[in-house]
Structures are given as structure tokens and as C-alpha cells.
Amino acid sequence: MFMFYIKWIKITANQKESRIDFAPGLNIIYGPSNTGKSMVLDCIDYMMGAGTHRFDVNLKVEKIQIGIDVNGEGLSISRDVNTQSFEVISHVDGIETSTYKLKGGKKNPPINDVWMKLFDIPLDTKILKTQEGKPQALTVRTFYHTFIIDEDRIHDKA
């Protein structure tokens, strides 16, 4: 079983890099308005397979990179903005260094495979989509909201 945490996120925008580091356990991102809190969450969402980003075009975001510690081993995922490709460099058994795609295909698996392996969830897991019992594939984006809580959801519950 994998124990993992996001170790860092690096954003390249307007040919400059910004990096935020995380620690194992609960990380809380807080601060005044317009300081980048939502940007961090948007980056994580985008790296977990969001088809589109919510980055302000004026920021000129070019690339997102994320570093993950998996039982002390390194895994990095890189994605150029407005592409469907993810470059994964893995030192983790069971996760291949390769080019992954948003949806996957014959040559490239979907990025969801990396995340599902990290969560130790079988890749072919299905869940019920509708009240009629129609099945759909379980993806990390299906349950993303359970471990990434944004400020809007906190205010909704207050």
C-alpha cells in the first residue's frame, strides 16, 4: 500500500517559477484575498486530470509540476497548460515513467491510472452514476472534493 503526500507544486508563469512546499499530514492554505490560495487548489485539480484550467489568462501560466513523496520515493508529474499530456517520472514500483494522457489511449494510459494506484484503488472500479443504476468509472476527480476543500465550501457550511 502506498503512503503518499504532495511534497511541492511548481508553477511556471511568464517565464518565472513559483514553488510551494507541503509537509506530511494536514496542510492549510490561508491568507488575505488575491494571494494565490485558489491558484494552488486549481493547480492540484488540473494535475489530477481536470480537462480545463481556471487560471487567469493574464498570469500567462505555462506549466504546472507536482512532486509527490510515495513511501520515501519520488514521483513527479508535469503538464504544460492547455495540453492533454502529462509527463510522469517515477521511482515508485508499479507506476511507470511515461507520457500519460487526460483520457488515455492505445499508446498512453490516462493520468487517472497514476492517482488510482497511489490511492490503491483498482483501475477498473465502477460506481453508480444515476438513480437508475447506470455505472461509470471511478476516477480521482469523482472524490477529489473529499480531501481538497476550498473556501467556498467552507463558507457554505458555516
Residue ranges and their predicted role:
Residues 82-158:
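Extended, charged alpha-helical "arm/stalk" segments used for dimerization and assembly
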Residues 1-77, 82, 87-88:
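Extreme N-terminal "head/tail" segments of very large remodeling/mechanoenzyme assemblies
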